[in-house]
Amino acid sequence: MIASSAKIHPSSAIEGGAVIGENVKIGPFCHIGPNVVLADEVEILSHVTVIGRTTVGKGTKIFPGAVIGGDSQSMHHSALNTTLVIGENCTIREGVTMNTGTVEHGGATIVGDNNLFLAYSHVAHDCRLGNNIILSNNVMLAGHVTVADRAILGGGSAVHQFTRIGRQAFIGGLSAVSYDVIPYGMLNGNPGLLSGLNVVGMTRAGFDRSTIHRVRRCYKQIFEGDGSIRANAAAIRDEYLDCAPALEILDFIAAESDRALSSPNRGAKG
């Protein structure tokens, strides 16, 4: 079904079964597969491929060369009825690739709202991305990666499968992210090590100086204490019940995960 207000270049191929919403714009030489849903006001520039069981949210804009909704690159996957869901008002720049999920792991790759994907970034199968995230050029997310709201990943950084990146974390360019990154953490290097807190991001998010000071103290207690990271975090939790960002860090550490925790020290992982 194609809405009457949609504007589609005659050189583009729209397969039967595709749903094209109101005021959608599709430029030249695009391919839209039969199981694709483009919500209202989506804009697709030239030479874009959207295939698979893919839904693109209202107002999202996709630039030339992007391939959205291709099968998982997992060697053991089954693509039957798997999906990719992209939220509203995302910007997907040149050459970006996003894959559908795998049957074995829930079947869905999910991307939230207001995200920015710069050129040649990659979102693999079964990833879960929140809102207001930035993936800079050539960022690579392996399968099953979780990225929370307002995280920023610098150019060329690579994230190991099943890794979690917490809210408003900052990943430096060319970093290798092999382990979970706490909310508000900054990670740099290869191997990636924590280098402190994303204080600039916390300030921009409206946290006052006293709150940031408490979160810094919490960070030191976690990573400079005598016990393991998880033991240190559990021991101080009651001190921070009234400090939301610190409590978020502590709960992130306590949560079950397939990966260990990034730290400032190569020898401490959990």
Curated annotation (Swiss-Prot):
Matches recorded under Gene3D superfamilies: Hexapeptide repeat proteins, Udp N-acetylglucosamine O-acyltransferase, C-terminal domain
Pfam families per record: Acetyltransf_11, Hexapep
Keyword Transit peptide assigned: no
PANTHER family tied to this protein: ACYL-[ACYL-CARRIER-PROTEIN]--UDP-N-ACETYLGLUCOSAMINE O-ACYLTRANSFERASE, ACYL-[ACYL-CARRIER-PROTEIN]--UDP-N-ACETYLGLUCOSAMINE O-ACYLTRANSFERASE, MITOCHONDRIAL-RELATED
Presence of the UniProt keyword Transferase in the record: yes
Record GO cellular component, one term: cytoplasm
Name of the protein in question: Acyl-[acyl-carrier-protein]--UDP-N-acetylglucosamine O-acyltransferase
Record's function text: Involved in the biosynthesis of lipid A, a phosphorylated glycolipid that anchors the lipopolysaccharide to the outer membrane of the cell.
Localization terms from the record: Cytoplasm
Predominant location category: cytoplasm
Gene Ontology biological process terms, A to Z: lipid A biosynthetic process
Assembly information from the UniProt record: Homotrimer.
GO molecular function, one term: acyl-[acyl-carrier-protein]-UDP-N-acetylglucosamine O-acyltransferase activity
Reactions catalysed, as given in the entry: a (3R)-hydroxyacyl-[ACP] + UDP-N-acetyl-alpha-D-glucosamine = a UDP-3-O-[(3R)-3-hydroxyacyl]-N-acetyl-alpha-D-glucosamine + holo-[ACP]
Similarity-based family: Belongs to the transferase hexapeptide repeat family. LpxA subfamily.
Pathway: Glycolipid biosynthesis; lipid IV(A) biosynthesis; lipid IV(A) from (3R)-3-hydroxytetradecanoyl-[acyl-carrier-protein] and UDP-N-acetyl-alpha-D-glucosamine: step 1/6
Lineage: superkingdom: Bacteria
Entry keyword set: Acyltransferase, Cytoplasm, Lipid A biosynthesis, Lipid biosynthesis, Lipid metabolism, Repeat, Transferase
Species name: Sinorhizobium medicae (strain WSM419)
